[in-house]
Curated annotation (Swiss-Prot):
PROSITE patterns: SNAKE_TOXIN (PS00272). One of its GO terms (cellular component) is extracellular region. Gene3D superfamilies: CD59. Inhibits acetylcholinesterase. The keyword rRNA-binding does not apply. This is Acetylcholinesterase toxin C. One of its GO terms (molecular function) is toxin activity. It comes from Dendroaspis polylepis polylepis. Expressed by the venom gland.
């Protein structure tokens, strides 16, 4: 699966992930900003919302 991959300080690159999922991590509370994207599906918490997806490629736009 091809996923977008970046943190708040790096620009987005396309990464070929071994696992079949991508994630997009964002703040749950205003200002709602995207904090990162990458491979896999890490758990969210009270402050972070993590949206995971498995297809198609670049699904974590």
């Amino acid at each position: 699966t091809i996923c977008y991959s970046h943190t708040t300080t790096s620009r987005a690159i396309l990464k070929d992930c071994g696992e079949n999922s991508c994630y997009r991590k964002s703040r749950r509370h205003p200002p709602k900003m995207v904090l990162g994207r990458g491979c896999g599906c890490p758990p969210g918490d009270d402050y972070l919302e993590v949206k995971c997806c498995t297809s198609p490629d670049k699904c974590n736009y």
